[in-house]
A protein has these predicted regions:
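Canonical Rossmann dinucleotide-binding motif of NAD(H)/NADP(H)-dependent dehydrogenases/reductases
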Residues: 2-34
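Catalytic loop of short-chain dehydrogenase/reductase
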Residues: 12-14, 133-158, 164, 168-171
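The beta1-alpha1 cofactor-binding region of Rossmann-like NAD(H)/NADP(H)-dependent oxidoreductases
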Residues: 58-69, 101
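Conserved NAD(P)H cofactor-binding loop of Rossmann-fold oxidoreductase domains
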Residues: 87-93
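Substrate-binding pocket helix/loop in short-chain dehydrogenase/reductase
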Residues: 95-96, 100-105
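A short, exposed helix-loop element centered on a Lys and neighboring polar residues
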Residues: 119-120, 164
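C-terminal helical subdomain
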Residues: 172-175, 179-181, 196-238
Length: 238
């Protein structure tokens, strides 16, 4: 009897060389069938054509009803997920006196409520197998509220606490939940010119390295599971 194909779902997959794309690619290389979820259909389709074992499922995770339908479609097409990775962010920046309160709700919906639905749609199958991995991409905003980042930070903190609650409830049942706090500027074609164009390479975390750490976490022995995983470049002040 042949071994069941492993299935991975990744939200927030952007352009090639970005974190989401690198996560999808490394799991695809490891023989997972990877369902990529993001709003940009063209970018997903381009990745699907270029790399093996990764499949395009365009969807805005902030549209919760469509997101749930997409997750059901993935299960019907590929099978129940063994690994799910919530990488989709919504990040509003600005003074709390000026930001639209609707943006706070949007940040919460993408960062936290979408995680809840991702887990609810995929966890039952994991529980039936008594194994599975749920990984979440976070950052230092989940641990502190900096000026002008109140909307983003408050919803990422909620995301982290939700993830911890899921880990405490379902870890004893064989489900590994890990929250990645990425304390770094990530080296992507979009981030480098926008944030710190003159910084040396050592200032940035590489998307490929982040993806590799996520894959390593899935392989951890049950006797040494991580929950809070902090990643930063060696030169980062903290």
């Amino acid at each position: 009897m042949s071994e069941k194909e492993k299935i991975c779902i990744v939200t927030g997959v952007g352009p090639d060389k970005g974190t989401g794309a690198e996560i999808a690619k490394i799991f695809g290389k490891k023989k997972y069938k990877v369902a990529m979820i993001a709003r940009n259909k063209k970018k997903l389709n381009d990745l699907e054509k270029k790399y093996k074992n990764i499949f395009s499922y365009p969807c805005d995770v902030g549209n919760l009803e469509k997101f749930k339908k997409t997750l059901k479609k993935i299960k019907n097409n590929l099978g129940p997920a063994d690994v799910v990775i919530h990488n989709a962010p919504s990040a509003s920046r600005g003074s709390i006196l000026k930001l639209n309160p609707d943006d706070l709700e949007l940040n919460f919906r993408v960062n936290t409520t979408a995680l809840l639905h991702l887990v609810r749609e995929t966890l039952p199958s994991m529980l039936s197998q008594k194994k599975g991995s749920i990984l979440i991409t976070g950052n230092t905003a989940a641990t502190r509220g900096k000026s002008h980042w109140g909307f983003f930070a408050s919803t990422k903190a909620a995301q982290r606490i939700l993830a911890e609650s899921i880990a405490r409830e379902f870890g004893p049942k064989g489900i590994h939940v890990a929250y990645f706090i990425i304390d770094a500027a990530i080296d992507t074609p979009r981030t480098r010119p926008y944030m710190q164009p003159d910084k040396p390479d050592d200032y940035f975390s590489k998307p490929t390295a982040i993806a590799e750490e996520m894959y390593k976490t899935v392989l951890q022995d049950k006797s040494t599971w991580s929950f809070r995983v902090e990643l930063r470049p060696f030169g980062e002040t903290w």
